Amino acid sequence: LDNHLGWVFTGVLATVFTGWLFVQFGVPKMAEYVAKITPPEMEAKLGEQALAGLDSQYGYFSPSKTEAAHKASIAVALGKLCVAIKECPHYRLEFRGGGVIGANAFALPGDIMVVTDEIVALSKNDTEIVAVLAHELGHVKQRHAYRQSIQGVLSGLILAAVTGDVSSVASGLPAALMQMRYSRAHETEADMFALVALQKTCLPPHAFADILQRLEAQAYDGTAPNNHNPKDKAK
């Protein structure tokens, strides 16, 4: 038996290493392919379910208390940017109280963009919010949230196959979306979309940097969430 332990150990290491390679490189490619062939209706349904889960089941969000007039001015400003650049994807803008999430804006599958009251309050003007949303539009355009969610599910299924716990894969998706970190390539794509959009509409790019610096200051104070790291976005 002792003579075979080395081979067994080597086989286990090879299996683990192969699995790691598949998760790191194979799963993202599979997620990209699945996203391309998925009907938009299916992605939209996933986004609706994720938002509903975040609203109720997980209690991340509360109804927005931002004044209706302020919401409208942000929506109009973002609409003007999209009209000017003519490259915006279809999107749906949602306002929520951030609760434990705090000051943030992010994309969900199905072209949904969520803006929290806290980041609206943190901004000094609508231009800063539009700059942040231009970045999120980059994620929407490239379907990054959906691709990341598929990647998470595929990785979860692999883990479930090992542990035998399948139920956690579906039930944990909304929470997983809140902890999701885009790859550096995805962030770069979103940053470039935002930069081009701001330049085409003659909006100052520093508006994006200014609000991110305030978000970063909050993070150092422990009052901002640790997901969607502002410092990473600023880079």
Which residues fall in each region the model found?
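A Zn2+-metalloprotease active-site environment signal
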Residues: D2-K235
